[in-house]
Each structure stands twice: as structure tokens, then as C-alpha cells.
Regions:
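Beta-rich carbohydrate-recognition modules and glycan-binding surfaces
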Residues: 1-192
């Protein structure tokens, strides 16, 4: 987080530092999280998560020490994840550590099995619980607590997931339009 405790756009939370710092792990719902060598790159340290038996089992990465500065236009974070299966819902939740009612949650779904991928989480698209929306993004809140939930909404059976490189991207990006051509015919009319 640079010289302050604000995770600015482009900054990354990773787990390679051997110096005790502001990033701590706290499990709930019978999750078990540990720092381990990346199973695909032993020079990198990642978080291993064994999914607990509760549908809401998760891991908090810091509480009350890092500020995640969401705004109306800066709503996107990414996390690099490894999942045993594709199609797994991963939820990120931000909240104020001093007021558990001040939250925002969003989901992403894995597309790869047994390999790393980067998932994008846009907090302007709040998650749902049993078809009901969770709290919408309120940029007046000071989010300083981040939790991750693997296979959210499903009972765990000790599956192992990994994550690393929590990044505050900031603004959502729009993919370029592909599959169409612009033909210039000299007078700005549609060409053929």
C-alpha cells in the first residue's frame, strides 16, 4: 500500500514478504487458511484455503488496517485464484470493521480448473443471497475489511483453493468491440 494504508489503484496485496505486516488472515465457518509455496511456482507465496463445511465459510484478509477506496467510478478489484473446478462462485466482501452493516459484496465465477486465473470483481454489481440483493455500494463507507469466500453458498467438503495478488484496479475497463469493420469511403457514409 505504498507509504500509507490505502490500497491505491494498481497496488497489490501479495503474501511474499517475510516481514510481519498489515496483512493477516482470519478464518470463519471452519475454513483453514495458511501461507504456502505456490504449487506451480515455489518462489511465490500464496494463501491455501481449505473450504469449511459452512456455506458462508470464508477468510478475512486484513481488518481495520488497509483502506479500499471505492468510489462511484473506481469499483473494480482482481484476485488471482486457483480452483479445483471451473464454475465455482467466488465472493469478495468489503466492510467497515467498526460497523458490520456497512458492506458490499460481489461475485465472480471460475472458468478454469486446476490452474491459475485472474478473476475480476466489480462492486457496482452487488451479489445476491437466495435471489435477494446484498447491500449496494455506498461510497460514503470507509471499507477496511476484505473477505473472500470460495464456492459461496455451497457446503464445503475440504476442497483446497489458492489465492494471491489482490489488486485494486479502480475503474472498470470496457473490452474493445471486435468482429466488425469500419470502412472509410471518403464521405463518411457506410461503405461496403
Amino acid at each position: 500500500t505504498g507509504d500509507n494504508n490505502i490500497l491505491d489503484a494498481g497496488e497489490v496485496i501479495n503474501f511474499n514478504s517475510t516481514t510481519p505486516g498489515i496483512y493477516t488472515l482470519e478464518d470463519f465457518g471452519n475454513n483453514v487458511s495458511t501461507l504456502i509455496a505456490d504449487p506451480t511456482d515455489a518462489t511465490n507465496t500464496v494463501v491455501s484455503v481449505i473450504k469449511g463445511n459452512e456455506t458462508w465459510a470464508g477468510t478475512t484478509i486484513t481488518s481495520g488496517t488497509v483502506i479500499y477506496p471505492l468510489t462511484a467510478t473506481n469499483t473494480v478489484m482482481t484476485v488471482r485464484v486457483w480452483s479445483p473446478e471451473a464454475g465455482i462462485t467466488v465472493r469478495l466482501k468489503l466492510e467497515e470493521s467498526a460497523d458490520a452493516t456497512h458492506t458490499v459484496e460481489t461475485d465472480a465465477v471460475t472458468t478454469k480448473a486446476q490452474e491459475w486465473e485472474t478473476l475480476t470483481f466489480d462492486f457496482s454489481n452487488e451479489a445476491t443471497n437466495d435471489g435477494n440483493p446484498t447491500n449496494p455500494l455506498n461510497t460514503d463507507y470507509v471499507f477496511d475489511k476484505l473477505s473472500i469466500f470460495f464456492n459461496f453458498g455451497s457446503v464445503g467438503s475440504s476442497e483446497t483453493y489458492y489465492f494471491d495478488d489482490v489488486t485494486f484496479v479502480g475503474a472498470a475497463t470496457t473490452d474493445p468491440v471486435t468482429g466488425s469493420e469500419l470502412v472509410v469511403n471518403g464521405d463518411f457514409q457506410a461503405g461496403s
